[in-house]
Amino acid sequence: LPISDMMRRAGMPIKTVSITSQKEVKGAHGITIIADMLYEPQNIVDIDWLILPGGLPGTTHLGEFKLLRQLLKSHASVKGNIAAICAAPSVLGDLGLLNGKNATCYPGFESHLAGGTYTAKAVEVSDNIITGKGPGMAIAFTLAIIVKSLGKDKADRKSVV
């Protein structure tokens, strides 16, 4: 929720997407979110960022969703921006998208950062990939996305945080 809120406050157009057959998605701790849209390949166009939320079992579902895996690989192949927080950087590692990059993740998922270098930092920016350690780092994670997209001045605005 803070990621979507802060990005919208910064003026970044975002769409939350459900990979299930329903817009209503329940998170790891029982928080229900209504996604803006369902994942339909024809609607996934003009992407600036692919952002993966963490948590379980959500991260597992993201990693198992074939169309998302294909989209992540395709987006990465053209140096598209990708961000993942908490357990979700493991999806990037499993796809080989962290090769040669620094990354961080929720404690216990370090072994899934294949090809990457685990740094234990709160947030890691490595080329086109941003990773965040966990839910407590959501604000810093989102600010890194905003800085990379719009510059530091935009991220420093009081209305963003």
Give the location of each predicted region.
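A cross-family phosphate/adenosyl-ligand binding-site feature
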Residues: K26-D36
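Short active-site-proximal "capping" loops at secondary-structure junctions
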Residues: I19-V25
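Active-site-adjacent pocket-lining segments in enzyme domains
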Residues: D5-I19, A35-V161
